Design a protein with these regions (language model features):
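N-terminal helix-turn-helix DNA-binding core of bacterial DNA-binding proteins
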Residues: 7-51
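Long, low-complexity, charged/polar intrinsically disordered regions in eukaryotic proteins
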Residues: 1-3
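Beta-hairpin "wing" of winged helix-turn-helix
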Residues: 62-77, 85
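Basic, amphipathic "hinge/linker" alpha-helix immediately C-terminal to the N-terminal HTH DNA-binding motif
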Residues: 75-97
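Basic amphipathic alpha-helical segments that dock to polyanions
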Residues: 52-59
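Amphipathic alpha-helical dimerization/coiled-coil segments
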Residues: 89-124
Length: 124
């Protein structure tokens, strides 16, 4: 995929970006993705099942994620679950989205819209 292909997918929707972030550390099933998004956003984003799976299907169609062949041990697994993984192209797009957002945040700091440090530790 070319830089042009990556750029054509930006900006990502917040849900699509969160799904990609949830898969950076490894494969997850849909419910696991949902819970990771809720945890990481400290409950600020609680995706419903329908929109989550529609977004996942769109990301699969775009080649950003794929259904994973890896599964947990049978005693820990439910065969009905679909596991997803981030593709190399999906990682490229996620990185490009982070760079795009970092630039915008930098502009906000330059314009003194915000001052000081921004914490992601969970304290508001």
């Amino acid at each position: 995929m070319t830089d042009q292909d990556v750029a054509s997918l930006l900006p990502l929707t917040p849900l699509s970006f969160q799904i990609l972030l949830a898969l950076v550390d490894g494969e997850r099933h849909g419910y696991g993705i949902m819970k990771e998004i809720e945890r990481r956003t400290r409950g600020r984003m609680t995706p419903a099942t329908g929109p989550l799976y529609l977004a996942a299907q769109r990301l699969m169609d775009q080649g950003l994620i794929a259904e994973s062949e890896k599964r947990p041990a049978p005693e820990l697994d439910d065969q009905r679950r679909r596991y997803y993984e981030l593709t190399p192209f999906g990682r490229q797009v996620a990185v490009a989205e982070v760079e795009r957002m970092a630039y915008l945040v930098g502009v906000a700091f330059e314009k003194k819209l915000v001052e000081g440090d921004i914490s992601i530790s969970g304290s508001d």
